[in-house]
Amino acid sequence: MIQERADIEKAYASNLRKFAARLEMFLRTGVEYGTATNILSGLAKEAEDNAELHSNIAAGLINPVQLGIKNWQRENFHKSSISTSIKEVKNFDSEFENAQKTWYKHYKNVNRCKKEYFHACKTVRSLQVQVQNAKNEPFGTPEQQAQRGKELRKMEDKLRKGIMEEEKTRKAYEEAISSLSDVTPRYIEDMTQVFNKAQAFERERIVYFKEQALQMQAVLDISAKPNLSQIFVELRETVAKVDADADLKKWSLAYGVDMAPNFPVFQEYSPEMSALGKKGRSALADGSSGGVTLTSLKTFTSPDRGGPIPGTTDSGSNISTSPVHTTDYTSSVNGAAAAVSKEKQRVEDTPPYPDFVDDGRPGVPIRALYDYVGVEADELSFNSGDLFEKLEDEDEQGWCKGRKDGRVGLYPRQLR
């Protein structure tokens, strides 16, 4: 019974943890954003905390409640080595049997004498009726009268013997009752002694199980748990932090009318720029090509044209621009590690590309077979063994679209 209740608590805790895990997984998809994520994270934490609470209840039912009962049973109920019966029960049966052994012998004798006496009485009553009927029959021929006379004498003789047997059995029955009465006080005394002993043993059992039931009640009384109210206080405080206006403003700054403008500006053609486009991504990902990677390009500004818009970034070609003099055209060539470091920092400060906004569609779970560090803002970074989702198959340049930790971006199908 206790084990069954503990299993119920364990199953409830397990279901709460599964529910919390699904909420956490939904949070990682990035569908919800801003302070509204507090709702899901708060519910997930409440489920985890309640799961822990009910896991502790299940553990408390097993130890000390169930374990204590099992130990008490081992100490007070011992199984026989030759049978499945309990030794204590068998001992009580033997003591009761010994206490009533003498009395029971007299009791059986009383029942036997009673049966014989009742049978003798029944026989006498039957013979009396037969004799009376024989005397009342009409007279017939002399021969018939002589025959009935003989039969009547036989019945009267049987009746006399029956009456004598009735007296004999009556006397035996009375003596048996008297003998039984003589041993009855001792029988009552012995039976009372054994019965009181059994009652004391049973009282000990009931008192112990009452104590264990009260302990079980204390374990199950969830209202008395000090951290129960705190769980829901924290949930309420977490949900209260949701700010719709702040979330809408943040979304507008990132994707709406309040976002920083990023309009195209004139850029002078350079052959190296082709390595930064989507057509040249395979070369950018190849660290063994022996070439160099163009990581920064400052715009050449004609004397008769104004400078580019300060702080703008061309997301299509991954080129940062800033107002410089005409002769200030330079290209910075660094090692792969330095380029990765600079690009990772720039990714954190650059709004996501419109083509890579998470629309919430389901993806195909995949596991990375290699390490890759995204060079551009629209690329994903991952380590070998990481799990993420594939959203689109490989394009003609060998790039796939995927989602990792709620962020959508590109990754190479394989390193070349």
From Swiss-Prot:
Domain of life: Eukaryota
UniProt domain F-BAR: residue ranges: 1-247
Domain SH3: 361-416
Pfam families given in the database record: SH3_1
GO BP terms in the entry: cytoskeleton organization; plasma membrane tubulation; regulation of endocytosis
Coiled-coil residues: none
GO CC term, one of those recorded: plasma membrane
Protein name, UniProt field: Antigen EG13
Organism, scientific name: Echinococcus granulosus
